[in-house]
A protein has these predicted regions:
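Low-complexity, acidic/polar, glycine-enriched regions of mature
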Residues: 18-158
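Acyl-CoA-dependent O-acyltransferases
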Residues: 7-10
C-alpha cells in the first residue's frame, strides 16, 4: 500500500518539536490510516482573531504510519532522499479561514482551509491534491491512494 499522500501529511504537520503532528490519509477502497511525526519545527502567531505562520518545516523522513512497509513506500513516493522536508512557507488566517503556500517535493502551491485556536494550539484542516506535487498513480494490487487527501494539523501558538 504505497501512499504519497502520507508525504503531504508529514509536510503539513505544523507543530513544534514538542507536539506530534498527524495527517489523515484516505485509501481507496481500504479505508483510512494516519501518518505521524513529531519532527516539525515552527509555530503560529495569534493576534486577536488573526493568525499567521512562516517556515513551518516538517522532516518527511520521520513520518510513521505504524506499518514498516507502508513507511518505506511513503519515503519512496515522497522522494525523501532528494526532498527530505515539506515546508509551509507562509500562512495567514482570520475568523477561522486561512490561506497559505506550501512546498512539497520542490513544488510550491497555494492552499486554503479552516482552523480554530484551542488554548495554545492552532488546529487546521485543508485538502491537497497530491498529483499537484508530482505524486501520481499510487497503486498496489488494486489498492490506491486518492489524489485528494485531507490534512489535519496542530501547531503551537505564541
Amino acid at each position: 500500500m504505497k501512499f504519497a499522500a502520507a508525504t503531504l501529511v508529514l509536510f503539513f504537520s505544523l507543530t513544534s518539536m514538542a507536539q506530534e503532528a498527524t495527517v489523515d490519509v484516505t485509501l481507496n477502497p481500504m479505508g483510512d490510516f494516519k501518518g505521524k511525526t513529531s519532527d516539525v519545527k515552527g509555530n503560529a502567531t495569534v493576534k486577536g482573531d488573526e493568525v499567521s505562520a512562516t517556515n513551518i518545516v516538517v522532516n518527511l523522513k520521520n513520518l510513521k504510519t505504524g506499518v514498516e512497509l507502508r513507511d518505506k513506500h511513503t519515503q519512496k513516493y515522497l522522494d525523501t532522499g532528494k526532498f527530505p522536508e515539506a515546508v509551509l512557507l507562509s500562512a495567514k488566517g482570520k475568523g477561522g479561514k486561512g490561506t497559505g503556500r506550501i512546498r512539497i517535493r520542490g513544488v510550491e502551491k497555494d492552499i486554503s482551509g479552516t482552523y480554530k485556536v484551542e488554548g495554545k494550539t492552532l488546529k487546521a484542516q485543508f485538502d491537497l491534491n497530491i498529483a499537484d506535487f508530482g505524486i501520481k498513480d499510487i497503486n498496489y494490487m488494486g489498492v490506491g491512494v486518492e489524489d485528494k487527501i485531507t490534512l489535519n494539523v496542530s501547531v503551537p501558538v505564541k
